[in-house]
C-alpha cells in the first residue's frame, strides 16, 4: 500500500515505514502529524485517485527529527566589473516516519 500526499508545496510518494524529509514543520520531535491532503492511495489492485483529493484519505506520521540540509552556494558575477558575490543557504527540514495510511 502506498500513497501520494502534498506537504510544503511538494508531493511525496510514501508507504508505511518509509522515512521522508519534508519542509520544516513547527511540531515537536516525537509527536504525531496527520496529512489530509492525500492525492492518491493504492492498495494492491485498487487505486483511489482524488479529484483533487481523496475523500477521507489520511497519512499519519511520527516526527523523527529536525535539521538543516546540505549547503547550496550561490554566486553572482558581473564580467569586467570586478564584482562578484558569494552566498550560501541551508534549508530547514523535518524528518518524519510514516506510521499509517488510511483510505
UniProtKB/Swiss-Prot annotation:
<dbReference type="GO" id="GO:0005840">
    <property type="term" value="C:ribosome"/>
</dbReference>
<keyword id="KW-0694">RNA-binding</keyword>
<keyword id="KW-0689">Ribosomal protein</keyword>
<dbReference type="InterPro" id="IPR036164">
    <property type="entry name" value="bL21-like_sf"/>
</dbReference>
<dbReference type="GO" id="GO:0019843">
    <property type="term" value="F:rRNA binding"/>
</dbReference>
<dbReference type="GO" id="GO:0003735">
    <property type="term" value="F:structural constituent of ribosome"/>
</dbReference>
<dbReference type="InterPro" id="IPR018258">
    <property type="entry name" value="Ribosomal_bL21_CS"/>
</dbReference>
<keyword id="KW-0687">Ribonucleoprotein</keyword>
<dbReference type="GO" id="GO:0005737">
    <property type="term" value="C:cytoplasm"/>
</dbReference>
<dbReference type="InterPro" id="IPR001787">
    <property type="entry name" value="Ribosomal_bL21"/>
</dbReference>
<dbReference type="InterPro" id="IPR028909">
    <property type="entry name" value="bL21-like"/>
</dbReference>
<protein>
    <recommendedName>
        <fullName>Large ribosomal subunit protein bL21</fullName>
    </recommendedName>
</protein>
<dbReference type="GO" id="GO:0006412">
    <property type="term" value="P:translation"/>
</dbReference>
<keyword id="KW-0699">rRNA-binding</keyword>
<comment type="subunit">
    <text>Part of the 50S ribosomal subunit. Contacts protein L20.</text>
</comment>
<comment type="function">
    <text>This protein binds to 23S rRNA in the presence of protein L20.</text>
</comment>
<dbReference type="GO" id="GO:1990904">
    <property type="term" value="C:ribonucleoprotein complex"/>
</dbReference>
<comment type="similarity">
    <text>Belongs to the bacterial ribosomal protein bL21 family.</text>
</comment>
<dbReference type="Pfam" id="PF00829">
    <property type="entry name" value="Ribosomal_L21p"/>
</dbReference>
Amino acid at each position: 500500500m502506498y500513497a501520494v500526499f502534498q506537504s510544503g508545496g511538494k508531493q511525496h510518494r510514501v508507504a508505511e515505514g518509509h522515512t521522508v524529509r519534508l519542509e520544516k514543520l513547527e511540531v515537536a520531535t516525537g509527536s504525531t502529524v496527520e496529512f489530509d491532503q492525500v492525492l492518491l492511495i493504492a492498495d494492491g489492485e485498487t487505486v483511489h485517485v482524488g479529484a483533487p483529493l481523496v475523500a477521507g484519505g489520511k497519512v499519519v506520521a511520527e516526527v523523527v527529527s529536525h535539521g538543516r540540509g546540505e549547503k547550496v552556494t550561490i554566486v553572482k558575477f558581473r564580467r569586467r566589473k570586478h564584482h562578484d558575490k558569494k552566498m550560501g543557504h541551508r534549508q530547514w527540514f523535518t524528518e518524519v516516519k510514516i506510521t499509517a495510511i488510511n483510505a
